[in-house]
Amino acid sequence: WYYQDYSVENQIHYINTIRSADWVYCHNVSDISYYKGLGCKDVRVMRSMMIPEGLDCQDGSLYKEGILLGGNFVSWYGGMDSYLVASDIPEKKYGVSMGRKQEQEESIEDIEYLPYLTWREWMKNIGQYKFGVHLMRTHAAGTFSMNLSFHGTPVIGYYGLDTQELLHPNTTVAVGDLRTAKFLMRKLYEDESFYKECSEETLHLFQKHYSEEAWMKDWKIRNG
């Protein structure tokens, strides 16, 4: 719903533009009813996809450490929610540098921020972290949950993102349910068997739902 931060004139222009389209592609199943409610005639899901050619899966949990936070401290990313949940366990926290990062974030002493990275640099870097937290209320492409799934890293996130729900079913919570998110954070940290279960499951689910072959199969089903 980022367009609702535009001027009123541009909001109306946006709605009229997508209403006039023959069909609209969206990221998530949960987006379909929204766009149809806006008046779009034909709405289809185009799943997010990554082609990991040349990348090594870093799925060993013994050498992993730290928590990677999925977004900055603005409402779009829900960075404060992620920070509060991650702070419930004694693991070092790492943050990402997105375009809407605030200058004051560098003053938070217990977060070490990654520099801006190319996608390939990003994918090689994130395999070292043991946990992911991305409590983003807005529905977008969900690449954070997907990228960490490739490395077998469990992610705590909100319902509404297909990548989160399909790849991390045991660590997905209702929007705003920080209590359950904190419970899961502690369980991942304290219960080795639960962590192993989530890690192995997300590796399997990545191949099932987000491999190139799975993407093509889903595309053909949705587009005939």
Kindly give the residue locations of the regions a language model identified.
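Conserved acidic donor-binding segment of nucleotide-sugar-dependent glycosyltransferases
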Residues: 169-179, 187-192
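Membrane-proximal helix-turn-helix segments that form the acceptor-binding/catalytic region
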Residues: 4-24
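Conserved catalytic-core segment of nucleotide-activated headgroup transferases in glycan assembly
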Residues: 51-119
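Short alpha-helical segment that forms part of, or immediately flanks, the ligand-binding pocket
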Residues: 123, 145-151, 164
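Donor nucleotide-sugar binding/catalytic pocket of nucleotide-sugar-dependent glycosyltransferases
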Residues: 22-36, 40-56
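Acidic donor-binding loop of glycosyltransferase active sites
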Residues: 127-140, 153
